[in-house]
Amino acid sequence: MSSREKSHHRRHSSPCNSDHSDHSDHSNYSDEIELYSNKHKRDKDLKIEITSRCHSRSSDSSSSRSSSPSSSYERKCKKNSHKKDSYKKNSHKKDSHKKECSDSDHQDKCSFEEIYKYYKYRMLHDKELMVTGSTSYLCMNNNEIVTIPKNYEVKLNNVSLKKNIDLGYINVPYYVREEGVYILFFVINSNQSSQFSFYVNGLEQPLTRYGNNSGAGQLILRTMLKLKKNDAVVIRNSRSSAATVAADLYVGGSLPGNNLTYLMMKIAPYCQPKCEEWDDKHLSKRKLYLFKKLLDKLLLDKDLMLKGFDIHGTFHRSTGVIVTTDTDVPFEATTNVNGLSWSSVVPEKVNILEDGVYKVFFLANTTTAAQLAFFVNGLAIESTTEGINIGAAQVSLRALLELKKGDILTVRNHTSANGSIEISEKTGGKQNDVDAILTVMRIAPLVQPTMDECKLNDYHKKYYYKFKQYLLNQKCLQIAGSNSYWNVTGDTKQILHASESLDWSNTILQENIWHYQGSPKFTIMEDGIYDLFADLTSNQPAQWCVFVNGTADLTTCFGRDSGGARTLLRQFVKLNKGDVVTVRNYEASSDVIETSTNAGGELVGQSVVFMAFKLSPITECVPCLPHHPPHPPKCDSKDKSKKPK
């Protein structure tokens, strides 16, 4: 039989048993009705279950067989639930009084201005950053006669400027309201040998104990300390040789002037923020474009100081000059000037180009008693008047001043007792050195910015840390205060021939500097402009200089024609990574210089101190050229049918 015949036979074979076939069909039909009925019942039960519990699924086998209707009802239920949630969120947005983007918004619904405000707010309140420069500082002076017995505290009666530092009932202690790294300066004008030191929370800081063996000169304490929030700072007569130290007025001139000056300022956070390795490839092109655009706007924001203490400069002279009464000290040269202006045509004046709080310092070697003061726009700042009663010595002034764009700063021989004063040259040695210097640096904006708390969606919030790391890795920025500093001292006798380096036996602080105790060398690890301070007490006239990579930096050479007192050295110096810095006996008049031991008092004192901190980076920030974002903006989520143009 052929296959075609077999197929035909199969199709027509059923009628042979018609009775049995009919019965079988009827039975199958009944079974189908029963099955449908059971299925309908199960579906009905399943609907009830899904309505009461939208997100649960039946685990039994019958429910598994009916998964298709279950999925349909689940989707419908979820859709209704989503509509309710969306309605609640929209209602919450309408009731909200915030003008910023809500967390439920899509990332593209936050404007650039809102994103900028949010990131700026976060940076202003980030304790690891100092995007507005120094946020804690104090400047005080005293114009009354005072006597200070041994172990008694020093009290000053006038506050020139302060921020985030509170004073006790008698103007001491000084309570620090922000933790951080601080530089502290104290000056007393006394006719007696004296020894003073800093105390923190009632405990003496022995490595800050300094003294002078000779009277009729300024004793200057300077140090750098890490202070915690609410620490109490006091200056005390440690154990001076005299039973009581008197600070006199009318020193070097016809005005009372100041016999005591105190200044402190925060230069860095207590701990430097962690700077992770960075690669722009970690970001999408769109996010990188946003970060660059934010940085461009931040650099133009007058509230901020993203480049550190980048407005600075020194103005100095290396030849002698006579300064008559009521005339200003002229300068011959400048070093590392940025954001200030000076002209050799009018060499006495420094022009301020940006508003701000400025730290100003002046130092000169004179052959006679002298009394000088800072002048702004031709008017004396009386609180800065200071002097010395002897010649062959250094006179110094320091202050924090609020200056505005267009102000003119000068140093004037206003009221010296001898009328004209002579600024000497080749002091303490055989070579030309710096005989008068004015240093100027902006430490903070004139007005600290305040902002209300900003809200932003979660998408942009989570990128703040990455944005912070992006800024920390920009070589042209310094958003976390000074990220490189050191403070070292020496308290033992050192005998130095010409060109020999000082050793430093005590390290108080160091950050991003390679140095070990007992070594004369400091290896720089961060490029930048550094503010260098050195106070060096010797028994003979001295001439000191900072050497960089074995070569004298002549802008840092300072001397003093008398022994028994401190020689001050001060300069802003450009240093590169890998540079090696030392302080040496340059070419003093004496063949040998011997440092003093326990000057001015009965306890161990520091005869030499050397400290520095980075003011600003060397690298210039280059603004990004205007360009379009790498991708067009996404469609608004409310109307996804529209395509971007």
Language model feature labels by segment:
Residues M1-H12:
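N-terminal acidic, proline/glycine-rich, low-complexity intrinsically disordered segments
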Residues R4-K6, H106-K645:
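Extracellular jelly-roll beta-sandwich "head" domains, especially the C-terminal globular C1q domain
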Residues H12-E32, R53-K76, S102-H106:
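Long, low-complexity, serine/threonine-rich intrinsically disordered regions
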Residues S13, E49-I50, K78, K83, ...:
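Extended, charge-dense intrinsically disordered regions
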Residues D31-R57:
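Long, low-complexity intrinsically disordered regions enriched in small/polar
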Residues D60, E74, D85, D95, ...:
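Acidic, Ala/Val/Gly-enriched low-complexity intrinsically disordered segments
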